[in-house]
Amino acid sequence: MSKTVVRKNESLEDALRRFKRSVSKSGTIQEVRKREFYEKPSVKRKKKSEAARKRKFK
C-alpha cells in the first residue's frame, strides 16, 4: 500500500502528484484491473502466449 505524508509547506496538488507517481510505480492500478474479473487459467495461458508472440515479431 502506498503512503504519502504531506510535507511542511507542500501544496495538496504536489502531494497528490507524488502519491499518484508512487502508486503507478508500484503497479497497484494495473494489478487491480487485472484481478477485477476472474480469468480462467486457459485464458491466462492464451494471453501470455499471444503477448510473447507479439514481442517476438515486433
From Swiss-Prot:
It comes from the Bacteria. One of its GO terms (biological process) is translation. InterPro entries: Ribosomal_bS21 (IPR001911), Ribosomal_bS21_CS (IPR018278), Ribosomal_bS21_sf (IPR038380). It holds the Pfam family Ribosomal_S21. Transmembrane segments: none annotated. Keywords: Ribonucleoprotein, Ribosomal protein. Belongs to the bacterial ribosomal protein bS21 family. This is Small ribosomal subunit protein bS21. The gene is rpsU.
